[in-house]
């Protein structure tokens, strides 16, 4: 096991499927003041929508179906994202479902908190750890891969 420092200014990925985009924008608006103190990232359409609706700067990746979910997963693996808020639609099959599953897997693997609904996102953003630096524990993957 090893500890990795998560900075007080979090790097937060914001992602939503089409049927959940309005809900995510509403959540961001409700927490705009807190989120303005952090660095925001998003997939193409979601990031654009959040930026337009809230005035917050959002660094944008590709749209989810075009590889944006995979780009976010890569940033997690590189240690460049600290939190994921992903409002996904559990009732609609997505053409990029394997990418979504891969993103969930990478977030768990690298111990990155992920909120998949508004209640969990509310709990996360109200946590004392949200605004301070935090030491998270990671498995030592090199040792696991050698066995």
UniProtKB/Swiss-Prot annotation:
Its EC number is 4.2.3.3. Keywords: Lyase. It catalyses: dihydroxyacetone phosphate = methylglyoxal + phosphate. It comes from the Bacteria. Residues 4-147 form the MGS-like domain. One of its GO terms (cellular component) is cytosol. The active site is at residue 69. InterPro entries: Methylgl_synth (IPR004363), Methylglyoxal_synth_AS (IPR018148), MGS-like_dom (IPR011607), MGS-like_dom_sf (IPR036914). One of its GO terms (molecular function) is methylglyoxal synthase activity. It is an enzyme of class 4 (lyase). It holds the Pfam family MGS. Substrate binds at residues 17, 21, 43-46, 63-64, 96. The keyword Lyase applies. GO terms for biological process: methylglyoxal biosynthetic process. CDD domains: MGS. HAMAP family: Methylglyoxal_synth. Catalyzes the formation of methylglyoxal from dihydroxyacetone phosphate. NCBIfam families: MGSA, PRK05234.1. Belongs to the methylglyoxal synthase family. This is Methylglyoxal synthase.
């Amino acid at each position: 096991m090893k500890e990795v420092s998560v900075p007080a200014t979090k790097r937060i990925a914001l992602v939503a499927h089409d049927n959940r985009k309005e809900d995510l924008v509403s959540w961001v608006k409700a927490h705009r003041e807190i989120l303005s103190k952090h660095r925001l990232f998003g997939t193409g359409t979601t990031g654009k929508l959040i930026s337009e609706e809230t005035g917050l700067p959002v660094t944008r990746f590709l749209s989810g179906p075009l590889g944006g979910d995979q780009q976010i997963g890569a940033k997690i693996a590189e240690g460049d994202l600290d939190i994921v808020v992903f409002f996904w639609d559990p009732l609609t099959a997505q053409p990029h479902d394997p990418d979504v599953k891969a993103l969930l897997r990478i977030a768990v693997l690298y111990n990155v908190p992920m909120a998949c609904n508004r209640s969990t996102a509310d709990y996360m953003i109200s946590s004392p750890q949200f605004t301070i630096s935090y030491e998270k524990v990671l498995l030592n993957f090199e040792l696991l891969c050698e066995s």
